[in-house]
Amino acid sequence: MTYEMPKLPYANNALEPVISQQTIDYHYGKHLQTYVNNLNNLVPGTEYENKDLVTIVATAPDGAIFNNAGQVLNHTLYFLQFSPKPAHSEPTDKLAEAIKRDFGSFDNFKKEFTAAAVGLFGSGWAWLSVDKNGKLHITKEANGSNPVRAGLIPLLGFDVWEHSYYLDYQNRRADH
């Protein structure tokens, strides 16, 4: 199986001023492309050669294959979750109901999610995920890990590796 770059559903400058075109060019065009290339070079001849990204991330031991597969999966979810002109500024329908049920309010969720992202030491990801019973969870995952390793389904991912925000926000992770 050959892993490919996800196609962005928006122009590289469409997320400005929140995420600059320069950041998209480097983050998507350079960092993610490198992870895709690395994964395509690592998996031939291994038990993961014909596995999808979720399976690799859920089952591979720590190491180069896991790290690169994790970053391809994480970045694919990350870049595809954005919309330059969202229809709503807050979740609606079932997700809104679940957030209210599990966090009390959307504002409480934002506070908890932001605290997780800002409080993650070093590089990694903050995630909103759902378990098999429909309960929402906020997790912090180091480096290229993903909640699928714990049997969760990721719904929203926030990249707190410095390459995701440093060109626009420098050392101000919380502003990102």
Tell where the protein language model's regions lie, with residue ranges.
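Feature for soluble, non-membrane regions of globular proteins
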Residues: 1-176
